[in-house]
Curated annotation (Swiss-Prot):
<keyword id="KW-0624">Polysaccharide degradation</keyword>
<protein>
    <recommendedName>
        <fullName>Endoglucanase 4</fullName>
        <ecNumber>3.2.1.4</ecNumber>
    </recommendedName>
</protein>
<dbReference type="InterPro" id="IPR018087">
    <property type="entry name" value="Glyco_hydro_5_CS"/>
</dbReference>
<keyword id="KW-0136">Cellulose degradation</keyword>
<feature type="active site" description="Nucleophile">
    <location>
        <position position="222"/>
    </location>
</feature>
<dbReference type="Pfam" id="PF00150">
    <property type="entry name" value="Cellulase"/>
</dbReference>
<dbReference type="InterPro" id="IPR017853">
    <property type="entry name" value="Glycoside_hydrolase_SF"/>
</dbReference>
<dbReference type="InterPro" id="IPR001547">
    <property type="entry name" value="Glyco_hydro_5"/>
</dbReference>
<dbReference type="GO" id="GO:0008810">
    <property type="term" value="F:cellulase activity"/>
</dbReference>
<feature type="active site" description="Proton donor">
    <location>
        <position position="135"/>
    </location>
</feature>
<keyword id="KW-0119">Carbohydrate metabolism</keyword>
<keyword id="KW-0326">Glycosidase</keyword>
<keyword id="KW-0378">Hydrolase</keyword>
<dbReference type="GO" id="GO:0030245">
    <property type="term" value="P:cellulose catabolic process"/>
</dbReference>
<comment type="similarity">
    <text>Belongs to the glycosyl hydrolase 5 (cellulase A) family.</text>
</comment>
Amino acid sequence: MLDKLKVINGKLTAGEKPVRLFGLSTHGIAWYPEYICEESFNALKKDWRTNCIRIAMYTDEFRGYCKDGNKQHLKELIEKGVVIAEKLDMYVIVDWHVLCDQDPMKYIDEAEEFFSDMSKRFANKTNVIYEICNEPNCSGTWDKITEYADRIIPIIRSNSPDALIVTGTSTWSQDIHCALEKPLKWDNVMYSLHFYAATHKGTLRSRLERCIEAGLPVFINEFNLCEASGKGDIDIDEANAWYEVIDRLGLSCISWCLSNSGDTCGVFTQNCTKLSGWTDEDIKTSGKIIKGWFEAFADEENTNEQCFRIDK
């Protein structure tokens, strides 16, 4: 059983020792359910040397949970992923993927039911992280997120009192400064920062550094090296600048995404249908760079207290 995750003095710890989590996020599981399998998760741990997987479940678009999705099937996929991750000693993020719905309060009733069910199912699993809203935006202001969190977090805590909870921030999880100015009242909570290197540059990095210096617990639970649309060219210079900050600050980071989509952000080429055994020819340029980041994190010396070492 993995150590419980806990935020201590603004830093993520496991067994009260500093820890860094890193890995890939799935695409929406209604789009790409095939990657929720032991074969893929094991390859990500052994070949990509990751220690965390994020399971993204859209709430609104494309068979979203709150629209036209099969709720029972989506929950079964999540549970399958959690069980596999536990078997492989990987942490797993259950992501309520707010995006087109903008304001997390739009589907508050469904969210309450979902997190009540999930936190009961996974009450005794120390590897589960609850991400309560992916990317609030536009009408999804920090005040709305706070209102939402104040309803969802007590539900999770009633069943999984020690679980780590991650909340999105406004403007597609870029406004971490709003959380710094007006943090949630709950313990063991981290705040999401998302970046796409070709779009989000020095201004957002400076904001991140200021918030970390002030003690805000930040989890980069979605990033890529391309544009925020998931398309376009990657920006190598900006990617390197982001890597330097992430590595220096010892931050946890999850990359979007585990798929063979035609977008730049999908790590595999479109003609790659493998679920493991991926070669360099199967992986897009951005995926190769991100894989290199994860390998570097895993290679950190034991003396680096920010590194979480996994079995090789």
